[in-house]
Amino acid sequence: MIGSGTAVTSYEGFALDSNENLYLGEYGKINVYKESSLLYSVDAHTSRAYAFTIQNDEILISTAETVYITDLSGNVINSYKDTDTSLFNELKRNKDSFSLNGSTYKMQKNFGRSRIVKDDGKVIYQMPILDYIVKIGILISMLWLAVLAIYLVISFRKKPNITNHKKDD
């Protein structure tokens, strides 16, 4: 489910436009929501990590190598090389917070379930329950794999060395 993009366990950041539409970064795309309804998706121009923000109703997307400036529909207006990755690093640092019209929005995690909360306490987005269940399932699987690996290492170390002793006749 994760490989197909149907379940998302982490986000690449978020931003809002002047109409308070939510832009939520996922794997290789930015989904645009209006009041919890998905409107459309914008291509992130990479299948790897990226960072983005919205300034003056334009999306700035940094792939650490290239910066794309797009309109709110995702049409590329301009692009340039980010040779020192400074914009990428700055956007990554600020990916869990966004300010618009004097209000601050923050990405919070409640037991691993992401949600975006306005400074007045209003939740404007929460990770879907299916995605959260998949995320918990992955964490439990990883924990079981670690326990299994430790068990196997311990059990192989405890095996006695069996050596053949010949009796002299």
Predicted region positions:
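Eukaryotic scaffold repeat domains enriched in small/polar residues
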Residues: 1-169
